[in-house]
C-alpha cells in the first residue's frame, strides 16, 4: 500500500466519519441535512471544458464536453452519497478527466435525493436522461459509470430498462466503484457485518437504515431499486466492479456476480485490500491512479 493510501485510511479512522453512518435515523437525518447545506447543484464557470445544463423531469443535468459539438459516445456518470447526500464541485475534475481521456461526453444528473423523494422518482429522472442520450448518441454508444450509490444507479439503469414494456438499447459498458446495496438475504447481511470492522468509511448500520429513507413512505418499490443485485442485467455489453476488499459493500459482490451470470453478461472484478470506500474516484495516489486508468481504458473502447 502506498504511503498516501495509508495516510488516507488513517485520516478516515481519525475523522469519525464512519460513526456518523451508524447514527439512529433521526440523528442521521440531521447530519445529512447539515452536510447538504454545502452541497448540491453547481454551474461550472471555468474554461477547461464546454458545459451545458439541461432540465430533465424538473431536475438539472450537467453535460461536459471536450468540444463544442457532441462526441460520438457518452457516459452517464452518477455521484455517490447514499442516495441522500448531494454532490460537490470535487466531482468536476473527475468528470473532465473522464471526458478528456475517454473521448466521451459526460452527462452528470443532479438526481432527486431520497431525503425528499422516493427512489422511484430518482430512477424516473435518470432513466429519462438515459433515453435522451440514446436518442442523441444512438444505441451502443452510451455507457454508465458511478461510485457508491451512484454505482447502484449505473447498474440500476440496466435493470430498470429491462423492466420497461419497450426497453431501450442497454449500456455498452457499466463501470461501478463500490456500488451501494441494501442487503436482502441473511447470507449477504452476514458477509457485510463481517467486513464492518475493517471498513473505515461506511458502517453496516447505514445499509439497513437507508432503506426506509430510500422508500420515502412508498411501499411499491421494485426490489432492484433498493438492492441492485436483484436486477436483470440482460443485454448489457459488460460490467466491471471495483472495490476495496476491506469495505462493507464488498460483501454484496457474490450476489452481483450471480446476477451477471444469470443474465449471461461478461464481468470483471478488481478488489484492493486496505483501500477506502470509492477510492478509485480520487485519482491522486498510486492505487487510485492505476485503477482509474483501467476505468478509462474500459470506457474508451
Functional labels for PLM-detected ranges:
Residues 1-67, 236:
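A glycine/proline-hinged amphipathic helix-loop "lid/cap" segment
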Residues 18, 52, 56-62, 68-301:
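Alpha/beta-hydrolase superfamily serine-hydrolase fold, recognizing
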Amino acid at each position: 500500500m502506498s504511503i498516501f493510501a495509508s495516510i488516507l485510511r488513517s485520516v478516515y479512522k481519525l475523522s469519525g466519519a464512519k460513526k456518523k453512518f451508524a447514527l439512529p435515523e433521526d440523528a442521521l437525518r440531521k447530519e445529512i441535512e447539515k452536510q447538504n447545506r454545502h452541497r448540491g447543484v453547481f454551474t461550472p464557470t471555468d474554461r477547461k471544458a464546454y458545459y451545458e445544463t439541461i432540465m430533465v423531469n424538473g431536475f438539472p443535468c450537467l453535460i461536459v464536453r471536450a468540444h463544442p459539438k457532441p462526441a460520438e459516445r457518452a457516459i452517464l456518470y452518477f455521484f455517490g452519497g447514499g442516495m441522500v447526500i448531494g454532490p460537490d464541485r470535487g466531482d468536476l475534475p473527475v468528470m473532465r478527466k473522464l471526458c478528456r481521456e475517454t473521448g466521451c461526453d459526460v452527462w452528470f444528473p443532479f438526481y432527486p435525493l431520497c431525503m425528499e423523494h422516493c427512489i422511484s422518482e430518482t430512477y424516473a429522472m435518470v432513466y429519462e436522461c438515459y433515453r435522451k442520450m440514446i436518442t442523441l448518441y444512438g444505441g451502443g454508444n452510451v455507457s454508465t459509470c458511478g461510485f457508491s450509490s451512484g454505482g447502484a444507479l449505473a447498474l440500476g439503469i440496466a435493470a430498470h430498462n429491462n423492466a420497461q414494456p419497450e426497453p431501450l438499447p442497454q449500456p455498452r459498458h457499466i463501470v461501478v466503484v463500490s456500488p451501494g446495496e441494501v442487503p436482502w438475504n441473511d447470507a449477504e447481511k452476514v458477509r457485510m457485518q463481517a467486513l464492518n470492522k475493517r471498513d473505515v468509511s461506511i458502517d453496516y448500520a447505514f445499509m439497513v437504515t437507508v432503506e426506509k429513507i430510500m422508500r420515502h413512505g412508498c411501499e411499491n418499490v421494485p426490489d432492484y431499486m433498493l438492492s441492485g443485485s436483484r436486477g436483470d442485467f440482460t443485454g448489457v455489453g459488460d460490467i466491471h466492479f471495483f472495490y476495496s476488499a476491506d469495505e462493507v459493500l464488498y460483501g454484496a459482490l457474490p450476489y452481483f456476480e450471480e446476477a451477471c451470470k444469470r443474465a449471461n453478461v461478461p464481468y470483471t472484478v478488481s478488489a484492493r485490500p486496505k483501500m477506502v470506500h470509492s477510492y478509485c474516484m480520487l485519482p491522486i495516489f498510486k492505487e487510485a491512479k492505476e485503477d482509474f486508468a483501467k476505468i478509462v481504458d474500459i470506457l474508451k473502447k
